[in-house]
From Swiss-Prot:
Gene Ontology BP term (one): ethanolamine catabolic process
Name listed for the protein in its UniProt record: Ethanolamine utilization protein EutJ
Function, as annotated: May protect ethanolamine ammonia-lyase (EAL, eutB-eutC) from inhibition, may function in assembling the bacterial microcompartment and/or in refolding EAL, suggesting it may have chaperone activity.
PANTHER family: CELL DIVISION PROTEIN FTSA-RELATED (PTHR32432), ETHANOLAMINE UTILIZATION PROTEIN EUTJ (PTHR32432:SF3)
Family matches, as SUPFAM superfamilies: Actin-like ATPase domain
Keywords, comma-separated and alphabetical: Chaperone
Pathway(s) where this gene product acts: Amine and polyamine degradation; ethanolamine degradation
Listed transmembrane segments: none
Family of the protein in this entry: Belongs to the EutJ family.
Database matches in InterPro entries: ATPase_NBD, EutJ, FtsA/MreB
């Protein structure tokens, strides 16, 4: 049975609360998922019930257009997350799940994790991970990340179509930097705390994203559209997509930044049951 926002929202709220905080002790088996994003690297741990119990997040420019351009930086962050989690739980993770943008080489993410000392227990593309987490049927998933937007169509629990477009939060930052006449780094920081203020300037970028999504889902006969990714947290996004797709039920849970990391960690729990930190 498909999960809904009432099922998902408390898990995302828990993840947001735990982010870079010291978690409570637990005796549960633990599964790790690592999300290598364009703007951030997130390592999330879930327990036997699929509940988030720890989240490490670093804002980092290590991935661009689905390619790890700063390999050493990415490996260093993942190792630091592993050290932090070992200190917190008293156990070292040896396996982790990860993901990749549709249409790119999964070895890119796998190589980072292996170089950090991990064995990859499961790997899948980002929108498929979200679709699996939510157990969707007859729905579309749009994962707007930092550098790319992943799109997947799910029918009867199976992904029947997926694509990746080179547009995302990085392009929003570029637009904002030009509008404000500030550096790209300043724009990245500014947009996180001034969402409503910057909406008029960045709205055209999201309109373009919605047009791209419309092209990919045309004729697919879906009834629901789920939005994921940190770039969806911009105020105004949900309303824009609902106006663009009035015939669809558009879902945008709070704290969508953590949807893909939760989906990745959960996929490891489901697909690699025996591979966990004990």
């Amino acid at each position: 049975m498909a999960h809904d926002e009432q099922w998902l929202t408390p898990r995302l709220q828990t993840a947001a609360t735990l982010c870079n905080q010291t978690p409570a002790a637990t005796e549960s088996p633990l599964w790790l998922g690592v999300d290598l994003g364009t703007c951030d690297v997130v390592s999330m741990v879930v327990d036997r019930d699929g509940q988030p119990v720890a989240v490490c997040l670093d804002w980092a420019d290590v991935v661009r257009d689905g390619i790890v351009w700063d390999f050493f930086g990415a490996v260093t962050i993942v190792r630091r997350h592993l050290d932090t989690l070992e200190q917190q739980f008293g156990r070292r993770f040896s396996h982790a799940a990860t993901s990749f943008p549709p249409g790119t080489d999964p070895r890119i993410s796998i190589n980072v994790l292996e170089s950090a000392g991990l064995e990859v227990s499961h790997v899948l593309d980002e929108p498929t991970a979200v679709a699996d987490l939510l157990q969707l049927d007859n729905a579309g998933v749009v994962d707007i990340g930092g550098g790319t937007t992943g799109i997947a169509i799910v029918k009867k629990g199976k992904v029947t179509y997926s694509a990746d477009e080179a547009t995302g939060g990085h392009h929003i930052s570029l637009t904002l930097a030009g509008n404000r006449r500030i550096s790209l780094e300043e724009a990245e920081q500014y947009k996180r705390g001034h969402g409503e203020e910057i909406w008029p300037a960045v709205k055209p970028v999201y309109e373009k994203m919605a047009d791209i999504v419309a092209r990919h889902i045309e004729g697919q006969g879906i009834t629901d559209l789920w939005l994921a990714g940190g770039s969806c947290m911009q105020p105004g996004v949900a309303e824009l997509f609902r106006k663009q797709f009035p015939a669809l039920q558009v879902h945008l849970p709070q704290h969508s930044l953590f949807m893909t990391p939760l989906a990745i960690a959960s996929s490891g729990r489901e697909k690699a049951e025996g591979l966990y930190a004990k």
